[in-house]
Regions:
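Aromatic-lined carbohydrate-binding/catalytic grooves of carbohydrate-active enzymes
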Residues: 74, 78-189
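Short, solvent-exposed loop/turn segments at secondary-structure boundaries
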Residues: 67, 190-192
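Bacterial Sec-dependent N-terminal signal peptides
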Residues: 1-41
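Generic marker of residues within folded, mature protein domains
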Residues: 25, 46, 81-83
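Catalytic-core region of carbohydrate-active enzymes that cleave or remodel glycosidic bonds
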Residues: 193-200
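Generic preference for well-ordered alpha-helical elements
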Residues: 68-71, 118, 196
Length: 200
């Protein structure tokens, strides 16, 4: 329903009614301008908010039954299905890539699951313009060694090998981040806060 303003006359009643109408229009206009300004401000703020870290990790779908082909395929699917464009930029190779430590304490990859080593995985993920991550444990052994009876995870944790493993994972293999679990740390009875602080 369209409401027309009253005719302006010199009679006091109409003058008062007209003033009320003008006051109402002025208040409504101010409210509309305020609402628009607030919406613009919110939109500007929303543009500056960084999304949380989002990505994919191999553990929930595959546990320790992973391979080079599986990781590459999942990274490809993240791009193909639009997850990368939606902000999912992290690909985490979870427990299951470990082979064994040699006599010098250097970690090697599982020869059957990752015959080409781990650097090609990081390079492949980087080629898709995403971040590559690895798993380890704060203790001696990994969760897979306890929950999945994966013998390769025994002694594969970062405990006692922090600088050595950091150089290998970040420097030599080229990974961007590391997920540090706590199954092995808990089994050793380590203080969680102190342990994670020392790793940092």
């Amino acid at each position: 329903m369209l409401i027309h303003p009253p005719r302006i006359t010199t009679e006091p009643y109409y003058i008062m009614k007209n003033r009320i109408y003008l006051f109402t229009v002025a208040v409504a206009s101010f409210m509309c301008i305020s609402c628009t300004k607030t919406q613009t401000t919110l939109s500007e703020n929303e543009k500056t908010v960084n999304p949380p870290i989002m990505g994919w990790s191999s553990w929930n779908a595959f546990r320790v039954d992973i391979s080079e082909d599986i990781i590459k395929h999942q990274a490809d699917l993240m791009v193909k299905k639009g997850l990368k464009d939606a902000g999912y930029h992290y690909v985490n190779v979870d427990d299951g890539y470990f082979g064994k430590r040699d006599d010098n304490g250097i970690m090697h990859t599982h020869e059957q699951r990752f015959p080409n080593g781990m650097k090609p995985i990081a390079d492949y993920v980087h080629g898709l313009r995403m971040k590559a991550g690895l798993y380890t444990d704060a203790g001696n052994s990994t969760c897979g060694s306890m929950w999945d009876n994966d013998a390769a995870g025994v002694g594969a944790g970062i405990y006692g090998h922090e600088p050595q493993d950091a150089q290998l994972y970040f420097g030599d293999w080229g990974f961007d981040f590391i997920k540090i679990d706590y199954c092995g740390g808990d089994a050793l009875g380590l203080n969680e806060k102190e342990r994670y602080t020392s790793i940092r």
